[in-house]
Design a protein with these regions (language model features):
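Alpha-helical transmembrane segments
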Residues: 7-18
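Solvent-exposed, non-transmembrane regions of membrane-associated and secreted proteins
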Residues: 17-244
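Short, small-residue-biased leader/transition segments that mark boundaries at the very start
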Residues: 1-5
């Protein structure tokens, strides 16, 4: 009957409106979180990093005393020149904690850049592992996958890690798509695990296989070549100067 048709029409319309509203909310929520994450990081960079006038250094100083008053989980600062990778590094007893939390403790799907809970916070381990989300906007470690291109590496062969004690140059050794249980995810990886990464690296490093005394940093983010794929970039730490 006409009444049944009309009722069906309104029921379908209500469902479509519900779907539209939910989708709209999801889109709004996504971009709202992106903007909140970007704004907060810009504020952190503005408030706690110091570039001295007239200095030609590529890197900068970080006011760790003030930054740690905001959050005592801050262990370091990671910086890739000519890139959005310019973030404090946090560490918590639970690796899941900063997957969805910002430095101020607020919930955000962008999360934070964070160090593996197993690592010593002063980079004294053989291999320090640092994680970040692969955001489609390029935030966090979204741009780390640029190292899948050798030409990008040729223009960006090093990063900087600032800590409360020492500033380091991070000379990049290899980048590879790996399984989440790859033996490289160890605070003391074997020489064979490192050699395997170098053999399949997405860029041609200028470095030789490092000796046992070298300290390494592994940067890790999601990749999409297969289920649970990860993309890692490994570098060798070189101390530049004491910061205390």
């Amino acid at each position: 009957s006409e009444m049944c048709i009309r009722d069906s029409y309104y029921a379908i319309l209500a469902i479509l409106l519900g779907v539209f509203c939910f989708s709209g909310y999801q889109i709004y929520s996504y971009y709202s979180e992106q903007n909140a994450s970007t704004s907060l990081n810009e504020e952190i960079v503005r408030e706690y990093t110091i570039r001295k006038t007239g200095e030609a250094k590529e890197y900068f100083e970080v006011d760790f005393d003030q930054l740690r008053q905001q959050n005592e989980d801050v262990t370091a600062w990671l910086y890739l020149p000519d890139s959005v990778i310019n973030y404090p590094v946090l560490q918590h007893g639970d690796n899941d904690y900063y997957l969805t939390r910002q430095i101020d403790g607020s919930y955000n799907k962008n999360g934070s850049i964070f160090m593996d809970y197993r690592n010593a916070s002063d980079f004294s381990d053989r291999n320090t592992i640092i994680y970040g989300h692969h955001m489609r906007t390029g935030n966090m470690f979204g741009k780390l996958v640029n190292f899948k291109s050798d030409s990008y590496y040729q223009q960006h062969d090093h990063m900087f890690i600032m800590t409360p004690q020492v500033t380091y140059r991070l000379e990049l050794l290899c980048g590879a798509v790996v399984e989440p249980d790859d033996p490289i995810y160890s605070i003391d990886p074997t020489e064979e695990a490192l050699a395997a990464c170098m053999r399949r690296s997405t860029f041609q490093t200028k470095l030789d296989l490092p000796g046992e005394e070298a300290r390494l940093v592994t940067l890790s983010t999601c990749s999409y070549e297969f289920e649970d794929a990860r993309y890692i970039v490994i570098g060798v730490l070189t101390p530049l100067e004491e910061t205390v």
